[in-house]
Amino acid sequence: MDINIKIVSEIDTTIGYHYLAHEESGGHSIFIGSVRNSTQNETVHELFFEAYESMALLEMEKIAKEASQKWNLQKVIMHHAVGTKKVKEPVVLVGASSAHREACFEACRFLIDTLKERVPIWKKEFFENKKVWVTPHP
C-alpha cells in the first residue's frame, strides 16, 4: 500500500487521480471538501484552519493504514489545508484506489469521517458579527 499524507497551505485538486492511478486498481474514489457560504442559516465569510502538524500527520497515517487493511487498497491520499480559506476554496482532499469500486467508495467515506473525528485540525468559522471554533464531528 502506498500513501500520500500532507498538511498543505493550498489543496491541489488535480493531484488525486494522478496519484491514485495503479495498474491493479479498477476504481478510484476522491472526496474534496470546500468552504460553503453558510452554516446554520448564517453567512460564512471565511474559515481558518490550524493543526498540530506532527500529530496530525501521524494520525492521518494511522487512518490510511486502517483503511488500507480493511478494504485492501492500493493507494490512499489525504491532504488537509491550513490557514485562511474563502468560500468555494478546497480545504481537504482524500481518496482511495482499489480493485473494485465498492471498496474505494467505502474507504473514502471512512477516510474523511475518521479524519474529522480524530485528527488534531481545528476550524474557526468567521461570520458577519462573530467567530466560532467548531467542535470536530464526522
Locate the predicted segments by residue:
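Short hydrophobic/aromatic beta-strand micro-patches
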Residues: 95-97
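N-terminal, polar/charged subdomain of small-to-medium soluble alpha/beta proteins
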Residues: 1-90, 101-109, 113-138
